[in-house]
């Protein structure tokens, strides 16, 4: 029955069994309602509580700082975490999601300094540590409310009520316990070393902090080539009239020259000399060219010394100090040999300042430079005479209180005055900067406490191989290589707001003693508690300065005068975040059994730079404390940048506020955009500010899902249908129904396979969220553009037949299953549809389980059905491509297509019902098949001569001859016979040739499916008058339907239509196809007028003009 008659039966009798929306969906509004539903009904809590206590999925939520608003990187990480947690919950696991806050460290301290108007450690101490730390405590959660708003709006489920904070005493006690454990294992030591130092923050940094993000930036430094005057002439060098010998040294840090204590050369470098006036300058032969160019440019006359100078002749020679400050230091100011000296941009001789370079420090320590007798406590004041702000102390009297970077020019001027400056340059190089202040770092000697990572490095490398890294190249690449070069970790910070190091030392070096504590009160026999040695009744807070007040006499001092005082340092906040697996549970003081049963975590994710941050510190502490990896599966995602590849920043104004995006497009669209992008696996997401990419997701993903739901509800409500879930394929007979159910089942299997971690032999790492998203998109494209479109007439039939009921049940079933499996990836829109389609055995889709599809068993006919559907959709695409190439509109019917098969039985044996589908889809009247492809195309053979030349180089000329004579054929094993079997011939391997099929008709093209050639399709493009008139009729129908949509008519509205045209062909077409037009457009009345003046009440009509034709269409709602 036609749709007009069908709808005429139900007009004014419609009642909604399924909730539906009219007009365009307002997705942000829909999302707000869903969020409200979740909150009012405690859906998140129920989703956790309803799962089996003994079937847990452990997920670690890394703690962010709450002193700034979340950005797109946080949202991306949150979307991944939430998606995996939702998926595992629907898979039957209990997934607790406890939010955490990183409260200590530089971010909090710097914010407080800014708010209090103070700067530097001295200013803080003057202000008062207690008041400063109280301000840190109050300000650190400044944006926690905004964080919760962003997290809630992105539809991320986390437990804020039971959150953990690194500043809580329970968390801090677990930190000091872990330090105590490391101490007992011999993995903690105190040492003076060279560390990267932020003078702006007045604290050292970990070596891995200088490798995170874009810590290295381009910096232009002033370099100087300095002449150090030897106190004695080198051995075996005798030159008349040379009064002094000088060593040329190049440095990029002139400010370190006042602290020079030695020079270093290499045994593997040849040196030479050049005489200028009465001075010989000595340098590496590799520097000679630069030396000569400089002399030429500055008109400096020189004479080359004509013999090589061996390093042996230079070693142990002494030289005059450049400055007076440390001239009396013993065992200094001599030339040493070192392996780290290489020829490069410098002179082959390195200036050694042991307080400002790691190699320098190690070399001088080995050589006992400076030699200090007795107490060595003043070593740092000699080798590193700067204060916390990188200003010289009074040891460097001429530059006292000057920042080291501000002294370069003055130092160079002094060297010029002393005739010790040979050359000055500007040098552009990558230089580490403070990740917090963007200021260039310095490297300086400091006393710090270290975790001896090098002791456990081999075990970390071993455990790393047990982790499922995604992408998998992280294992042996970025993280694996980082572990191979792991260094000991400086964990102490000479700051204020942090967990204090639980170390007490004697204040008298004559009576040394160190006490390390691991708990506040005595809990374990093997863990030293503070209450054993101190009165802790007044200590309610482990922070400074309260814990600093715990002082006692040194038991090892018989005089009773020295005291045990806590070292002033606090922990690196990376140590705290690396401790979160156990510290959030107050392990081992509480939850001991729980932690030990469920460690390590099943899953973790952060952006890829955390391989040198949080992932790394987790790994160190987990290996050292528990001999286990901290997690089993890890996604390392990339970063979100603007379209120019620049970091998103307020200064550049190159991004939109995420909340504005949510309110305009919805968070599901943003979620799916990110989850379906390669950013999940370490790539960069270039996000446009205007929201173009998110609109694409709305159009291509969200709306198709909504449209399938909307189509079902409209017609199910019209028919008063209550659809049922299909549980077995044998309930269905229609090939379209069986096909879409099979596609649904296969899609669900694909999503399961993408998400589930399998054994490594399967090459499936699991957690392939992008692939799962692609499968969802692909299915709804098939559902809307194939199944629903192909089956519309079944839904439009007036009688409720079994076929019609099957169509409803089929559509209802695939929506039901796909909504469930899509819920983790699109949690809000799936919930909205779930509530409207009465799938409510469960209160929420997120309280349901992933689809159980075990009852659906695909037989051979189903598999063949899928293959045929795949085949005809493939052919459709090629035919439509030919139409597009030749500008033949799809609505224009054509006479026939011819399909030429190439070794494809499925093509030649295509059943009639599939042929009919194909013809309808491409709007063609008939189809024919041929088995001889040579009628329409020919193969072109190309030989891979580089490969053949390796195997049979002496036969290449004969191969060319046989090829030109077209003497070849394909063998069954995909090899090629060149020549004839009876005469000269060669067997060519499949990697030694390629075949290309060339068609001989512009209206033909090859058919390729899954990279296999199936044949050629030819489209007959000749048009008869009958075909032309039918095409015009279809154009008119489309014009009317577009006008209905543009003017927001309901799908059931009847209309009156008037066509205005003087075109005889158009009029003939309308007369011929009038009944078809009326049926397709719900027209009650239909008329043709040649003159506009003949149309009565024209103002009541909506007017549309057909493109490329002198035709106007007028329509209005019918009142009959």
From Swiss-Prot:
Transmembrane segments: none annotated. A motif ('HIGH' region) lies at residues 64-74. Its EC number is 6.1.1.5. It catalyses: tRNA(Ile) + L-isoleucine + ATP = L-isoleucyl-tRNA(Ile) + AMP + diphosphate. CDD domains: Anticodon_Ia_Ile_ABEc, IleRS_core. Keywords: Aminoacyl-tRNA synthetase, ATP-binding, Cytoplasm, Ligase, Metal-binding, Nucleotide-binding, Protein biosynthesis, Zinc. It holds the Pfam family DUF5915. GO terms for molecular function: aminoacyl-tRNA deacylase activity; ATP binding; isoleucine-tRNA ligase activity; tRNA binding; zinc ion binding. Gene3D superfamilies: HUPs, Isoleucyl-tRNA Synthetase, Domain 1. It is found in: Cytoplasm. Coiled coil: none annotated. InterPro entries: aa-tRNA-synth_I_CS, aa-tRNA-synth_Ia, Anticodon_Ile_ABEc, Ile-tRNA-ligase, Ile-tRNA-ligase_type2, M/V/L/I-tRNA-synth_anticd-bd, Rossmann-like_a/b/a_fold, tRNAsynth_Ia_anticodon-bd. ATP binds at residue 650. A motif ('KMSKS' region) lies at residues 647-651. One of its GO terms (biological process) is isoleucyl-tRNA aminoacylation. One of its GO terms (cellular component) is cytoplasm. Its cofactor is Zn(2+). Belongs to the class-I aminoacyl-tRNA synthetase family. IleS type 2 subfamily. Monomer. Catalyzes the attachment of isoleucine to tRNA(Ile). As IleRS can inadvertently accommodate and process structurally similar amino acids such as valine, to avoid such errors it has two additional distinct tRNA(Ile)-dependent editing activities. One activity is designated as 'pretransfer' editing and involves the hydrolysis of activated Val-AMP. The other activity is designated 'posttransfer' editing and involves deacylation of mischarged Val-tRNA(Ile). HAMAP family: Ile_tRNA_synth_type2. IleRS has two distinct active sites: one for aminoacylation and one for editing. The misactivated valine is translocated from the active site to the editing site, which sterically excludes the correctly activated isoleucine. The single editing site contains two valyl binding pockets, one specific for each substrate (Val-AMP or Val-tRNA(Ile)). This is Isoleucine--tRNA ligase. The gene is ileS.
